[in-house]
Design a protein with these regions (language model features):
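Short-chain dehydrogenase/reductase
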Residues: 94, 180-181, 240-243
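Short alpha-helical
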Residues: 11, 89, 187, 249-250
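N-terminal Rossmann-like NAD(P)+-binding domain of SDR-like oxidoreductases, especially those catalyzing
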Residues: 1-178
Length: 321
C-alpha cells in the first residue's frame, strides 16, 4: 500500500512511519520540520536527526502542507491512504498565534482533503485530539457531546467535521483518532511529561498546575499502534476512535513518580491553569473491538523508558532551572 504521512518526523509520526515500513508499505513523508518556536532550533535539529535514523526507506519531502508541494506529491505517488498528523503541537501555541494556527490546522487540512479527492485517495486518517471533548471525567466515549475550550480544540473538532463532509460527498472514507497526552523517547521539551522529566534531571522545581487535575498519559508506541491499525483495518472506515492508555493519572502523581524515578527534583503546587479543561481517562472499547487495539505500556514503565532514553541522549544537559 502507498501511504503518505504528514508530520512524519514528529514524535508520533516517525513511530507510525517505522511501523508502516516494517510491514512493507511504501511510505512518503511531508514535514516542515518546525515546532513553531516551542524549543530552540538546535534542539529540534537534534531530535529530527535522531528520528530520521530510525526511518530506513521512506521518501522525505521538507515542505509545508499548505504548499503546492503537497498536491505534487499526491499526483506523483497516487497514494492509497493519507495519515494526517501535521498540526500545531499544542493548545498554548495556537492560543498565542491563532492566525498561524488556523493556517496549518484548517487551510493545511483543506489542502490535504482537496488533494486526496483529486487524486483518488481511498482513506484519510485524521489525527484529532481529546481536547475536542472539553471538560470530561473518566470513561468518556467517542459518542459524548464535544464542548471544546480554546482554539486548539475548536479547530480540531472543526477538522473532524470537514473530514466527515468529504466522506459524505463520496470522496473517500476516513478514520478519526483522538489521542491524549502522548509522551516517550524523542519528544520535545515543552509538554508535561518531558518538562517534568528534564526539570527533575536538572535538579529543578516541578511546577504542578492543579494537583488533582488528571491526564490519560499514553506511551508513544501504543498511540502509533492504534493509528496504524486505523489506517489499515477495513472495518475502521468512517469511525472515530479514542487511542489512549485509558487510565487517568493526576499531575501530582505524575510529578511524584518522576521525582522518584530520577531521584532528583522537588515539587511546587500551583493553581490549575484556567485555559485548560479538566480531563480524565478515555474509553477505548471501540478501538479494542474494531482495531484490536491493546495498549501495553503503563505509566510507570513508560516513565522509566523515557528516563532511560534521556540519560543516554545528547538532548538534555544540567541547565539552570
Amino acid at each position: 500500500m502507498k501511504i503518505l504521512v504528514t508530520g512524519g518526523l514528529g514524535l508520533i509520526g516517525h513511530n507510525v512511519v517505522r511501523r508502516l515500513e516494517a510491514q512493507g508499505h511504501k511510505v512518503a513523508i511531508i514535514d516542515n520540520m518546525t515546532t513553531y518556536g516551542m524549543i530552540p532550533q538546535s534542539e529540534l535539529d537534534y531530535l529530527i536527526a535522531e528520528r530520521q535514523k530510525k526511518i530506513t526507506g521512506s521518501l522525505l519531502y521538507s515542505a509545508s502542507i499548505t504548499s503546492d508541494t503537497l498536491d505534487y506529491i499526491c499526483y506523483r505517488h497516487k497514494f492509497d491512504t493519507i495519515i494526517h498528523m501535521a498540526s500545531f503541537p499544542r493548545q498554548k501555541v495556537v492560543n498565542a498565534n491563532p492566525t498561524l494556527g488556523a493556517d496549518t490546522m484548517m487551510t493545511g487540512l483543506l489542502n490535504i482533503l482537496e488533494s486526496a479527492k483529486k487524486h483518488h485517495v481511498k482513506r484519510v486518517v485524521y489525527i484529532s485530539s481529546s481536547m475536542v471533548y472539553g471538560d470530561f471525567e473518566d470513561d468518556v466515549t467517542e459518542d459524548a457531546v464535544c464542548r471544546p475550550q480554546g482554539q486548539y480544540g475548536i479547530m480540531k473538532l472543526a477538522g473532524e467535521d470537514l473530514v466527515k463532509d468529504y466522506t459524505r460527498r463520496g470522496c473517500f472514507d476516513h478514520a478519526i483518532i483522538r489521542p491524549s497526552a502522548v509522551y516517550g523517547p524523542l519528544d520535545v521539551e515543552d509538554r508535561v511529561v518531558s518538562k517534568f522529566m528534564l526539570t527533575a534531571m536538572r535538579g529543578g522545581v516541578l511546577r504542578v498546575n492543579g494537583a488533582n487535575e488528571t491526564l490519560d498519559f499514553t506511551y508513544v508506541d501504543d498511540a502509533a499502534d492504534g493509528i496504524v491499525a486505523a489506517a489499515l483495518v477495513p472495518a475502521a472506515a468512517n469511525q472515530t476512535f479514542n487511542i489512549t492508555k485509558s487510565h487517568s493519572v493526576s499531575l501530582l502523581q505524575a510529578a511524584e513518580m518522576i521525582v522518584k524515578i530520577v531521584a532528583n527534583g522537588t515539587i511546587e503546587l500551583r493553581d490549575k491553569d484556567a485555559d485548560f479543561p479538566s480531563r480524565g481517562a478515555l474509553n477505548i472499547d471501540r478501538a479494542r473491538a474494531v482495531l484490536g487495539y491493546d495498549p501495553q505500556v503503563d505509566v510507570a514503565e513508560g516513565f522509566d523508558n523515557y528516563h532511560a532514553w534521556f540519560k543516554n541522549s545528547l538532548y538534555w544537559a544540567p541547565k539552570t532551572v
